[in-house]
Swiss-Prot record:
Coiled coil: none annotated. InterPro entries: G3P_acylTferase_PlsY. Catalyzes the transfer of an acyl group from acyl-phosphate (acyl-PO(4)) to glycerol-3-phosphate (G3P) to form lysophosphatidic acid (LPA). This enzyme utilizes acyl-phosphate as fatty acyl donor, but not acyl-CoA or acyl-ACP. SMART domains: G3P_acyltransf. Pathway: Lipid metabolism; phospholipid metabolism. The chain crosses the membrane at residues 4-24, 70-90, 111-131, 152-172. One of its GO terms (biological process) is phospholipid biosynthetic process. This is Glycerol-3-phosphate acyltransferase. One of its GO terms (molecular function) is acyl-phosphate glycerol-3-phosphate acyltransferase activity. It catalyses: an acyl phosphate + sn-glycerol 3-phosphate = a 1-acyl-sn-glycero-3-phosphate + phosphate.
Amino acid sequence: MIGIYIAALVLGYLFGSIPFGLILTRIAGTEDLRSIGSGNIGATNVLRTGRKGLAAATLLLDALKGTAAVLIAAGFGGAEAAMLAALGAFLGHLFPVWLKFKGGKGVAVYIGVLLGLFWPAALVFCVLWLATAYTTRYSSLSALVAAFITPIFLWWFGHPTMASLFAVLTLLLFWMHRDNIKRLQSGTESRIGEKK
């Protein structure tokens, strides 16, 4: 079983480390995504290029790589392997070896692995994100609010192990958004659709 668990973790990491935002913007001929806006490779920064279609595609593919890793691991290793694949995918997106361990902030992958493990929680995350984004126009705040609620939701609905996993992922997500949190506190955070 140890071998299966390691395989699930590695599989998740490899899936998660695929930098779709960077790949899509290069194919589209835009400037290097890491040199504009926040320098992040995720969908929010892709949106700052003005290419809404590319941003949507990045969001979708970043989420689906997490979902795919979870479902594949579940197929060969069960629920425990699926959760390890979720962890691996999240870490792979945050710290991809191909980009010198400088990746995205993990929101789309967070949604994707959540979708693969327990889809009602992913639905709740999306509703919370959309509601917060609609009222505040802050992508970062929307993600932080939704992620904060996710482990609580999982625990409440009888998934303590999964809740523990997502508590860890949420802490990592908050850490990756530490600069956004500072800007939110100072009132200098960019709103959705704004270019930096």
